[in-house]
């Protein structure tokens, strides 16, 4: 089902994709598709799921570079998804942008489309490089700096992918059949969300009980919670533990906390590998 990156190297690969609530730390929808499947197709599946759940209104979907296309943007406009998309610098609408502009995507009589408005924003990063964002948010009170900050809200999804790969080892499948692979993929998504639920509750309790005289702020240790959840949940499902084990984990997590280090930044490492 999933396909091979190289016929001479017989290991299977697939495309995992998620739509992630960056404020509440939950994976809203996840999909696992064959190797070299379209990321835009995966994104459309996520949008369809948000529509089915009726949870897309008053939410802004933030897309990384590579997801933008005129068809994708038109879909968001027609289905009333608020969106913010990073543009590649070689797109014409990006080349024509200086500052903050509203322009028109012209109709196509052959496709039966109409003119639609699109707002393009130029943002300058700390290192002086320019990025370009496209949106259907036309409120003039939302400034370029606000859009810059809004786009950076998507960064937690990168750490969520890292969590799935490193802490939950979502790429290390023990099964060989399609059904078992999908089961392992989605159980790891479930474990991630369960860990987030526990962490959110613990963080709330830590904030309530924190003293104003404390020099540092603390939060629950995510790695500790994930490690314990991976051990506890299978035993609960096998009736070796009862649900009270999660209450015990909650109390343990209140004691095992980590210091919040605000303002930390890390230089992003560029992948120097040459693609096939």
Residues of each region from the PLM?
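Two-metal-ion RNase H-like nuclease active-site motif
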Residues: 1
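Single, function-defining residue in the core of a domain
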Residues: 4, 8-276
């Amino acid at each position: 089902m999933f396909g091979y990156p190289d016929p001479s190297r017989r290991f299977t690969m697939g495309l995992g994709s998620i739509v992630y609530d960056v404020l509440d730390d939950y994976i809203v929808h996840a999909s696992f598709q064959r190797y070299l499947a379209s990321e835009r197709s995966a994104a459309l599946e996520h949008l369809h799921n948000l529509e089915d759940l009726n949870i897309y209104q008053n939410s802004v979907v933030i897309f990384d570079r590579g997801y933008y296309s005129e068809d994708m943007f038109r879909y968001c406009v027609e289905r009333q998804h608020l969106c913010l998309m990073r543009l590649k610098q070689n797109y014409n609408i990006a080349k024509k942008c200086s500052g903050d502009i509203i322009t028109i995507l012209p109709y196509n009589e052959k496709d039966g489309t109409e003119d639609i408005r699109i707002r393009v924003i130029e943002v300058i990063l700390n290192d002086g490089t320019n990025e370009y964002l496209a949106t259907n948010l036309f409120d003039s009170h939302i400034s370029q700096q606000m859009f810059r900050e809004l786009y950076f809200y998507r960064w937690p999804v990168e750490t969520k992918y890292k969590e799935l790969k490193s802490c939950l080892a979502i790429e290390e499948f023990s099964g060989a059949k399609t059904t078992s692979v999908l089961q392992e993929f989605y159980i790891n998504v479930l474990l991630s969300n369960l860990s987030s639920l526990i962490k959110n509750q613990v963080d709330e309790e830590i904030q309530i009980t924190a003293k104003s005289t404390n020099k540092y702020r603390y939060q629950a240790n995510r790695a500790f919670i994930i490690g314990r959840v991976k051990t506890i949940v299978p035993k609960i499902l096998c009736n070796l533990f009862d649900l009270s084990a999660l209450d015990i984990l909650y109390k343990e997590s209140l004691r095992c906390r980590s210091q919040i280090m605000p303002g930390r930044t890390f230089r992003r490492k560029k992948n120097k590998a040459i693609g096939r």
